[in-house]
Amino acid sequence: MVPIVEPEVLMDGEHSSDVCLSKTSEIIKKCFEELILHKVDLSGIILKPNMILSGTQSKERISSEEVSNKTLECLKNSVPSDVPGIAFLSGGQSELEATENLNLINKNNNTNFIMTYSYGRALQQSALKVWSKNMKDRE
C-alpha cells in the first residue's frame, strides 16, 4: 500500500501566485513535519500537490514557464529529498493549461522527484461535455 499525501491550495479566490507559493510551501512543510513525527517512511509515499497558480478571480495571470519555476521552487524548498514521486492535481485547470504546465515542469525538473499527474477533470471535461449533449447535437 502506498500512501498518497494530498495537500492542496485551491484555485478559488483572488490570491496571487506568490500567495499560492507561500501557502502551498507552508502547508507541505507542515504535512511533512507531521509525517516525520509519526515515523512515516517518506521513501514510500507519493505527494499529490497543486501547481503554483494565481486564483481564478485574480487579475494576475502567469505563464506556464512561471508556473513551472514557482512549482519547482516550492517542491525544492518544501519536500524532503527521500520522497520519490510527485503526482500533480489539475486543480480545476483546463486540459490545455494542465498539460502545458505539467510539460514544462517535467522539462525544467532539476530535482530528484519523479513527476507525473493525477488529473480527473482536466482529462475528462471535453468528453463529459460531448456526452452530456443529445445524440442529435453530437455530430
For each feature predicted by the language model, list its residue ranges:
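Conserved strand-turn element in the central/C-terminal portion of the radical SAM core barrel
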Residues: 6-16
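Active-site capping/gating regions of soluble enzymes
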Residues: 15-139
